[in-house]
């Protein structure tokens, strides 16, 4: 998904020019941040807001300091959206290594109690991109065992896949798609 129109606003995806091919660890995040900040500075005059394209909210603080437009992170946006209409939500992400960071972010914004289940599908980002059916199978296999009122896919590659396929529930559990959460929050800030 390279661009999309949401109402009268236009959403465009810009890729960094260098850095890791996918973000699957803290080390990948650290290597990607300088490239993200550089990209935001380069395009600041062209856009009214930026959405971090990785679910981890990588580089959000650094990017906010570097530009004057709003910078929205999918973790916080999706946690906030889920908390608005449910008392408990779960997060299903790509691997177990990233779970502590999401737990910490939920605590930072006061939603740790509502984030009742954190799980990993153990699916590399590259698999989501190159073999989406296999990735969806792995996601569903874990989701079916989760006991939550709503579920957040904790990877933007999953979010794009769900958007492209019109998926709004998995295993009978409603999905809060971080892609849509971040877009709507960004829109509300630039009206």
Model-derived segments and spans:
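A structural micro-motif
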Residues: 8-9, 69, 87, 113-116, ...
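Short, acidic/small-residue loops that bind anionic groups at enzyme active sites
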Residues: 64-85, 167-186
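Hydrophobic alpha-helical
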Residues: 49-52, 56-60, 142-171, 182-186
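N-terminal active-site wall of soluble small-molecule enzyme domains
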Residues: 20-39, 53-63
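Glycine-rich, highly charged phosphate/nucleotide-binding loops
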Residues: 25-45, 132-142
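General beta-strand structural signal in soluble alpha/beta enzymes
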Residues: 13-14, 52, 71-74, 152-153, ...
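N-terminal glycine-rich anion-binding loop in soluble enzyme alpha/beta folds
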Residues: 1-34, 93-132
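Conserved beta-strand elements of the Class I
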Residues: 89-92, 152
């Amino acid at each position: 998904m390279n661009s999309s129109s949401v109402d009268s606003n236009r959403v465009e995806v810009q890729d960094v020019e260098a850095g890791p091919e996918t973000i699957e660890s803290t080390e990948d995040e650290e290597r990607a941040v300088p490239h993200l900040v550089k990209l935001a500075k380069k395009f600041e005059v062209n856009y009214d807001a930026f959405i971090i394209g990785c679910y981890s909210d990588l580089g959000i603080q650094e990017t906010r300091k570097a530009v004057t437009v709003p910078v929205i992170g999918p973790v916080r946006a999706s946690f906030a959206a889920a908390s608005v209409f449910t008392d408990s939500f779960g997060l299903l992400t790509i691997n177990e290594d990233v779970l502590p960071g999401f737990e910490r972010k939920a605590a930072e914004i006061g939603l740790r109690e509502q984030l009742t289940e954190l799980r990993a599908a153990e699916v590399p980002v590259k698999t989501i991109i190159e073999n989406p059916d296999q990735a969806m199978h792995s996601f569903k296999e874990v989701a079916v065992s989760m006991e939550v009122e709503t579920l957040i896919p904790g990877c933007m590659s999953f979010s794009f896949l769900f958007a492209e396929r019109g998926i709004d529930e998995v295993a009978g559990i409603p999905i809060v798609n971080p892609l849509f959460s971040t877009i709507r929050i960004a829109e509300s800030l630039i009206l």
